[in-house]
């Protein structure tokens, strides 16, 4: 058995075709929670939900966000009310004292629901209401996620990286902002000066995550800084990865990134925005899968294939390369 680390869309796209390569029925997916926000009192977990919706075959695969065919009537009414009341429709980050009040899991990422700067679908909202209500009843985020997975018919463990708060904050030339404000509202346009994973020094991986990371690990072609970075910022996860076989898929072709702001984020965090930089950022990776057009010399075992991901056939091809990388390490995986 293998365990996948998932953040953003890279790993879900990889798992899109994994069923014919790995025994995915029992394959845990450990998800980034640094992107999570509390929006209008609801705890929203974008990376967790992308994995849940993909596994339930309900994901909007055009955007790789939200539920396919969902409506947005509540969101549109929130925007209309804000306009009618002449309220600022940009992200409304709550005052500092509010950021550490209320449920701990939402620390440093609380936004007002006025105008709702992130588009939340109506069916999607039901998931967030259920999650938040379970948390308020005393459930851990891991337990709430397991309940949602069961309700959606997901047959493999979907594990938040921690039940403790970790918030990804981007230091920009326009100020320090949460990742969702940087990515959704500001369209990743501000100059990046650095990245902070607030709370990571005190956060612990859950017992379920520790158990999952005892198996060989696959890191998909996700953003090394904001998708995988919050996870490896946890001392317990970083140590676990150093003690288990890890194969990572590069999100770059040499110095060209497939999508998103990974290049700017890596440069701001002190890494070359390239496959070579990914290797430096992942000292715990034992082998890599890189694109067939990528001639970057790496000092660890490397398998080359077409790493473009968009269909189940693409995911299957790259997963077979991942399996080959484990074979080269002498690691048997189911």
From Swiss-Prot:
SUPFAM superfamilies: CofD-like
Keyword set includes Transferase: yes
Ligand binding (7,8-didemethyl-8-hydroxy-5-deazariboflavin): 49
Enzyme class, broadest EC rank: transferase
EC number: 2.7.8.28
Record pathway: Cofactor biosynthesis; coenzyme F420 biosynthesis
UniProt keyword annotation of Signal present: no
Pfam families: CofD (PF01933)
Assigned protein family: Belongs to the CofD family.
Cited HAMAP family: CofD (MF_01257)
Protein name: 2-phospho-L-lactate transferase
The species this protein was found in: Natronomonas pharaonis (strain ATCC 35678 / DSM 2160 / CIP 103997 / JCM 8858 / NBRC 14720 / NCIMB 2260 / Gabara) (Halobacterium pharaonis)
